[in-house]
Amino acid sequence: MVDNKIPEPGPAKLKRNAGPDEWLEAAKDCKYLSEQHMKQLCEIVKEYMMEESNIQPVSTPVTICGDIHGQFYDLLELFRVSGGMPDGSEAEAPKTQSAVITSDDIEPPSTISDPKLRKKLRNTFAPEDGSEDSSASQRDRSSSSGSRDVELKRNFVFLGDYVDRGYFSLETLTLLLCLKAKYPDRVTLVRGNHESRQITQVYGFYEECFQKYGNASVWKACCQVFDFMTLGAIIDGRVLCVHGGLSPEIRTLDQVRVVARAQEIPHEGAFCDLVWSDPDDVETWAVSPRGAGWLFGDKVADEFCHVNDLTLIARAHQLVNEGYKYHFANQNVVTVWSAPNYCYRCGNLASVCEIGDDLKPTFKLFSAVSDDQRHVPVSRPGRSEYFL
């Protein structure tokens, strides 16, 4: 049985002259906007995005979020774990147990190689007596370590793949666009490989829009927003955020800054590589099994970070069971994954990565909210269709 306080999905019932404030409140409640309001929202957000650089500068403190994939109720949990939405509303306690992992806990190159740390995670997410106290202590730890960050107003960088596969792609994207419209300087939406016309026609977002509106006009408006999403973000000039990875055509950040981004994602080239590439155990470059982008190795990452004076490349794009993963011994590439129990069947943890002014990453891990904390659409696609 679903808790009656849980946001119930459905169409928003707003006056015709409603604006961003009303849209945001409706979006928080898992309501999708009318066709008219959604198109207005897309135009507002598009105007802000047109002014952004291909690599948008962002100041610390920052919360970096990975793939969401239409998992609306887990996105709400992400905000609870992160201390609240950018609107400054009072943060709720997480519905699931969470853990805080700092860079001091990590032994390269594996994500979690320390047996003590593995035990810590196992104990944190195991349903044991006293777990509530454990969760509270974790929150105390994170709140005390981040109190200065709260005062400075935390920024959010989302690394793309907001839609497809999950049950509520439209509502998820609507909430993020509303936050962008209301707080344009505090929310950065990076483009992922799923923010494209071709991919969304295959993996669910197009079909969802058509089902809810009876036509494709809102989907088209959202795709125009996708075209203006930034290709990356740079935190305090030292931490690069992209969806996928690096490109053999890109050696410097200035080369990214001059890429023509206001278009559908090309099938090859630098733009394509930024949203499709993956780090892997290769020396330099290798052909990607995805059919787009490249696999890049530690030598490539080391050189790119050296040339561009970077301490870290934060990216998403790949499911990692423990919520995040460092890929190389130098710990200069990390995957952040923010869709727990991906496709409602993978059983994985999720994380957000918090970067303070010392530029040391702290990971907050969380799991999917329980069934009584979410709604499931009656006419939902079969899970096998989405697990592609």
UniProtKB/Swiss-Prot annotation:
The keyword Ribonucleoprotein does not apply. Residues 86-146 are annotated as: Disordered. Binds 2 manganese ions per subunit. GO terms for cellular component: chromatin; cytoplasm; protein phosphatase type 2A complex. Mn(2+) 1 binds at residues 67, 69, 161. Keywords: Hydrolase, Manganese, Metal-binding, Virulence. GO terms for biological process: cell adhesion involved in biofilm formation; cellular response to oxidative stress; DNA repair; fungal-type cell wall organization; G1/S transition of mitotic cell cycle; intracellular signal transduction; negative regulation of isopentenyl diphosphate biosynthetic process, mevalonate pathway; regulation of actin cytoskeleton organization. Disruption phenotype: Leads to decreased mpkA phosphorylation levels, increased sensitivity to cell wall-damaging agents, increased levels of beta-(1,3)-glucan and chitin, impaired in biofilm formation, and decreased protein kinase C activity. Also increases sensitivity to several metals and ions, such as MnCl(2), CaCl(2), and LiCl, but it is more resistant to ZnSO(4). Impeairs the virulencein a murine model of invasive pulmonary aspergillosis and induces an augmented tumor necrosis factor alpha response in mouse macrophages. One of its GO terms (molecular function) is metal ion binding. The keyword Magnesium does not apply. It catalyses: O-phospho-L-threonyl-[protein] + H2O = L-threonyl-[protein] + phosphate. InterPro entries: Calcineurin-like_PHP_ApaH (IPR004843), Metallo-depent_PP-like (IPR029052), PPA2-like (IPR047129), Ser/Thr-sp_prot-phosphatase (IPR006186). It comes from the Eukaryota. Its cofactor is Mn(2+). Mn(2+) 2 binds at residues 161, 193, 243, 317. The active site is at residue 194. Belongs to the PPP phosphatase family. PP-6 (PP-V) subfamily. Protein phosphatase that acts as a modulator of pkcA/mpkA activity involved in the cell wall integrity pathway. Plays an important role in regulation of adhesion, cell wall integrity, biofilm formation, and virulence. PANTHER family: SERINE/THREONINE-PROTEIN PHOSPHATASE PP2A-RELATED (PTHR45619). This is Serine/threonine-protein phosphatase sitA. It comes from Aspergillus fumigatus (strain ATCC MYA-4609 / CBS 101355 / FGSC A1100 / Af293).
